[in-house]
Amino acid sequence: MKNLVFTSLLVLLSSASLLSQESTSVYKIEQGFVNANGVMIYYEEFGSGKPLMIVHGGPGASHDYFLPYLLPLDRHYRLIFIDERGSGKSERLEDVKQYTVENMVEDVEAVRKALGLGKMNLLGHSYGGVLAQAYAFKYQENLSHLILCSTFPSTSMMNEVFVKIKDNMTPELRERINKMESEGLFGHGLPYERNRYTDEYKIAAWGEGYFPYLYQRNPDPDYDPAADGFSWALYREMWGSNGEYIIDGNLKSVEYTDRLHTIKIPTLINCGDNDECAPSLSELMHEKIPGSELVIFPQSGHMTFVDQPNMFIKSIEDFLH
C-alpha cells in the first residue's frame, strides 16, 4: 500500500532546566502519521538539518521518555521520533503475531521513504537498539551513521545478565519476585490489572529490582514503576509472559552477534556503567562492529540521557559532526 503522510503543527515550550548549555527556548513540532503498508505509525519532528531518526525501547513503550532530554539535538539535526507499531499513538493491531522486529524494520523504512529522509542517521535505545541493528542488517545503504544506546545483540546473553541482576537482589526481594512469577503474572488482581502486571509486581520488579540499573546519578523524580503506559499485548508477544527477568517471547530469536561484522557504517555504541543492559554487551558490539566507537557513561544506569544529559548530547554531536 502506498505510504501516506498526515501532518499537523504545534509548538512545545522547553524546560528551562533541560541543559545547562544554551539552547533554543521554543521547539517547533511537526507531527503526523505515516501509513506504513497499512499500519498507521505516529511520528514527531523537531529541528532541521541532517535527519536523525530515534526509536524507543520497551518493546511497547513510546517516544515520550526521550523528551525533553534529546531535544537539544535539534540545534543541528532534523529529529524524527516514532512510536513503533502497537506503541504510543501508533496503531494497535488485533493480530499480535504482527508485532515482530522484522515488521518494525519495514515500518522504519516506510517512514524514511514517506518523509523523504534519504540517507539518515538512526539512534535506537534499549529494544530500539535491537530494532536499529536489524534495520542496519537489511537497509544499511540508507544509513549514514548508527547509534546503539544501552542495548544488546543477543537475547541469550541478555537473559544471562538478568540472572545476575536477580542474584544481586536481597534474598527477600528475590523470593517475593520469584513467588509472584511462579504463580503466573497475568489474570490476577483487580479487573483492570488482569491483562497486565499487577501493581505489586511492577513495584517489586521495575521499582525495587530495576531501579539501580535505570538511574544512578540523576533519577527521574517522576519515575513511577506502577504507571501503566505500555502496550501490554505487544509486550507479552515480544518480551513474553513470564516476568521481567527472562525474555521468552518472539524476541528470543534475536541472536545478532555473528552478523555484527557486516555493519560497515560509522557506529557509536554507548551505555551506562551500571546499565540494565550490562556494559559487557556494549563492549562485545564494539569488538564486533569494525571501526565502531564506544562510550560508557559514569554514574549512569539504563537511562543515560537522564543521568548524564550533557555528556550524552555531546557524545552524539561529536560523533555525528
What are these regions (language model features)?
Residues 292-321:
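Catalytic active-site module of serine/aspartate enzymes centered on a nucleophile-bearing elbow/loop
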Residues 263, 269-271:
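Short beta-strand/loop motif that positions the catalytic acidic residue
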Residues 276-281:
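Conserved alpha/beta-hydrolase "acid-adjacent" motif
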Residues 84-127:
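Active-site loop/oxyanion-hole signature of alpha/beta-hydrolase fold enzymes
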Residues 118-161:
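Conserved hydrolase catalytic core segment
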Residues 179-258, 265:
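Alpha/beta-hydrolase
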Residues 39-92:
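Conserved HGGG/HGGXW glycine-rich cap/lid loop of the alpha/beta-hydrolase fold
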Residues 147-191:
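Flexible "cap/lid" loop of the alpha/beta hydrolase fold
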